[in-house]
């Protein structure tokens, strides 16, 4: 496995690849790095995403996980840039429940590229004891503030959208 770290508006990221596919994006900086063509391309695509110039990633991905987790990852990658889907909507697509989908989102090994930040709680719900409102949680660096920043970057709270990114998450 090889890794490449990069700075981003939501914190330092370390990209990992193995056998020609991206297998992880972790928060933080890796002490040992080795740039490969794939990692350089992944960094370029992430830079373009953060600059607002890329809305669809085109990278080979191989996230670890069960068949259920991979099914949830597939649904998440189908959510268009700037759009959101509720945990319950994702659950319906994979024949499960919202809480299980939330668990998969929380263990997503390739955040941003597999856009778990686009999965939100249903309006008017209070999911779990840690979060309230319509955003749901976010286990990545910076928590819900990072989720909010990614959704704002994508314009998910723009005119005609029903997502309120100004919610208090306490």
Predicted regions: what they are:
Residues 105:
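DNA major-groove recognition helix of helix-turn-helix
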Residues 120:
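Short active-site segment of divalent metal-dependent hydrolases/proteases
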Residues 1-96, 145-170:
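Basic nucleic-acid-binding alpha-helical/helix-turn surface characteristic of O6-alkylguanine DNA
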Residues 123-135, 139-145, 151:
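DPxDG-like acidic metal-binding loop motif
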Residues 108-114:
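Major-groove DNA-recognition helix of helix-turn-helix-type DNA-binding domains
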Residues 116-117, 150:
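Hydrophobic alpha-helical packing residues
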Residues 95, 110, 140-144:
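Short, amphipathic alpha-helical segments
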């Amino acid at each position: 496995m090889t890794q490449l770290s990069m700075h981003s508006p939501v914190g330092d990221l370390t990209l990992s690849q193995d056998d020609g596919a991206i297998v992880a994006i972790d928060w933080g900086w890796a002490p040992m790095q080795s740039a490969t063509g794939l990692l350089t391309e992944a960094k370029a695509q992430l830079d373009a995403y953060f600059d607002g110039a890329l809305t669809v990633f085109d990278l080979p991905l191989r996230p670890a996980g069960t068949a259920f987790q991979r099914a949830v990852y597939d649904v998440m990658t189908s959510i268009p840039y700037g759009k959101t889907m509720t945990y319950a909507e994702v659950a319906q697509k994979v024949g499960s429940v919202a809480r299980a989908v939330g668990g998969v989102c929380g263990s997503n090994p390739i955040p941003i590229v597999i856009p778990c930040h686009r999965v939100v709680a249903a309006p008017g719900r209070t999911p779990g004891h840690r979060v309230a409102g319509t955003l749901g949680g976010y286990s990545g660096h910076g928590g819900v503030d990072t989720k909010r920043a990614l959704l704002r970057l994508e314009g998910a709270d723009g005119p005609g959208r029903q997502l309120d990114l100004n919610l208090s998450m306490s």
